[in-house]
Amino acid sequence: TLVYSKLIPYLTENLERNQMIVGDLVANRGHHNLILSDRLQHLQQLRAMLPAELWELTAMIDGKMTSKSAKAKRIQAIEDMRSGRIRYLFASFGLAKEGLDIPRLDRLYLTTPKKDYAVVTQSIGRIARTFEGKGQPVCYDYVDNIGFCENQWKRRRTSYRKAGCIL
C-alpha cells in the first residue's frame, strides 16, 4: 500500500517534476500566478528554481506567518499581488482556504495532489473572480503516473466539472 507521508516528499523532491512546474511558471510570466503546495519547502524550492530575473516578482505566504512582522509581510505580499507589483504568489493550500481575495489572479498551479472537493473548489475560486482585462483563467493540475494520484485526479476532475471548468 502507498504511504501518503512518503508519496508527498517523493513528488515534491522530484527534480524533473519540479522543472516541469517551473517551466510552466516561466511560460506564464505575463500572468498573475498562484502556486499552491502542501509543503512550504516545496514552495521554497520552486521559487528558488525560477530564473533570477523573476525573483523580485515573487512572494511567499503561509499560515505560520502569525507574528506581527510576519503578518505584515503576508498582508504586503497579498497587496503586491492585488496591485500587480508581483506576478507569482507561492502559498500553502491551508492559507488559500482563508479567504485569499485577489481578483487579478488568472493562473493556478496545484503542485501536490488533492482530492477534497472543498479545497479544490476554493482553490479554483481564487482564479475565477472577475477582473477588468482578465482573460480566461487556467488551472495547472499536475497528475502523476501513480495509481493513488490518478484516483485523486478523477475526484478533482469531478470537482472541476461541478465548478463549470472546461477540461
What do these predicted ranges mean?
Residues 18-19, 71, 93, 117-121, ...:
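Amphipathic alpha-helical transducer elements in NTP-driven molecular machines
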Residues 40-42, 95-97, 113-117, 128-129, ...:
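Conserved nucleotide-binding/hydrolysis micro-motifs of P-loop NTPases
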Residues 126-159:
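Conserved segment of the helicase C-terminal RecA-like domain
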Residues 1-51:
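Conserved interdomain hinge at the start of the Helicase C-terminal
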